[in-house]
Amino acid sequence: MIELENITKTIGGKVILDNLSLRIDQGDLVAIVGKSGSGKSTLLNLLGLIDDDYSGRYEIFGQTNLAVNSAKSQTIIREHISYLFQNFALIDDETVEYNLMLALKYVKLSKKDKLKKLEEILERVGLSATLHQKVSELSGGEQQRIAVARAILKPSQLILADEPTGSLDPENRDLVLKFLLEMNREGKTVIIVTHDAYVAQQCHRIIELGEGK
C-alpha cells in the first residue's frame, strides 16, 4: 500500500529525513514516535501527499512520486485519505453539520441519507445534541471528537493522525484512541504520530525516528 525507498528531505539546508525506507501494508496500525524535530510530522505530510519536495521513491496506492497538485494525487486524497490533526482543522464559525458534511462531499447519497449518517456518527462519539451548534461553542475534547467523527465518515482506506490526543485529558484521549482502533479493526490503515507512550503501545508497529532515520 505504502512504500518509501531512500527518502531524503531537507529544509533550509538541514536534513529532516535521511535516506529513509519503510513499508506499510493495508490494515496496519502504526505509531511514529521520536523526539521533537526528528521528522515525524514531515514524514506524515509526505505520506499524506501534502509535501512532494523530497528525493527518493514514494509509492502509495500503486502510484509513484506524485506531485501534490496532480490530478492523481488529488483523487487519492479525495477518495482514500482522512487526516486527523492536533489542531482539529475544523471551521470554527460553522456548525458541526457543515463540518461533517465536508467528509461526504463526494459521496453519492441524498441529503436525507447524509444527515442520517451524521446523526449516527454523532451518537457514536457521544455528541448527538451538537449537530446545529457552532464548532466554536464546543470544548477542546468535543472538537477533537468531531474531528474523529469526520475521519470516520469519510470512506477512506488510510487515516493519518498527527498528535491526535496531544492536548486532551485522559478521558478524551482514551475516547479518541478507541475510535482510531475501531477504524483499524474495520480494515483501515491507521498511522499515528504521537509522543504518548500509551498510545504507541496500542499499535501493531512502532517506527521510531531519530535524526530523520
Show which residues each predicted segment covers.
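Conserved signature/switch motifs of ABC ATPase nucleotide-binding domains
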Residues: 78, 133, 154, 186
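Helix-to-loop junction immediately C-terminal to a conserved catalytic motif
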Residues: 48
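Short coil-to-helix segment of the ABC ATPase nucleotide-binding domain corresponding to the Q-loop/switch region
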Residues: 94-102
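Conserved ABC ATPase signature
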Residues: 134-138, 142-144
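Catalytic Walker B motif of ABC-type/P-loop ATPase nucleotide-binding domains
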Residues: 159-162
